[in-house]
Regions:
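Terminal leader/tail segments of proteins
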Residues: 1-83
C-alpha cells in the first residue's frame, strides 16, 4: 500500500470526519473480514470489503454510505481497492 496522505478531512452525508491511515489499520486489528462481494482492501494480511473497513474506522453503520464513498475515502488515504 502506498500512502498518499497520513490523514484526511472529509464530509460524509453532511457530517465532518478526520481519518488517518493509523486509524484505519488499528480499527481493523482483531476484526475478521466479512465475505468479499466484489471489491476488497488489503490491510496487513487480510482482505476486507471497503464498506466494512470504513464502517469500523468511523464507527458508523454501513447503510449510511455507499461502496463508492468507501472507495473514494480509502484511496485518498492511499489504500488500494482491488476487484
Amino acid at each position: 500500500m502506498e500512502h498518499v496522505k497520513e490523514s484526511i478531512n472529509f464530509k460524509l452525508r453532511g457530517k465532518s470526519y478526520n481519518l488517518s491511515v493509523d486509524d484505519v489499520v488499528s480499527s481493523m486489528k482483531g476484526i475478521r473480514p466479512d465475505g468479499i462481494l466484489k471489491y476488497y482492501v488489503r490491510i496487513g494480511d487480510m482482505d476486507y470489503p471497503p464498506k466494512q473497513v470504513l464502517s469500523e474506522s468511523l464507527g458508523i453503520q454501513r447503510i449510511s454510505f455507499t461502496t463508492k464513498d468507501a472507495y473514494d475515502i480509502l484511496t485518498r488515504l492511499g489504500f488500494v481497492v482491488e476487484e
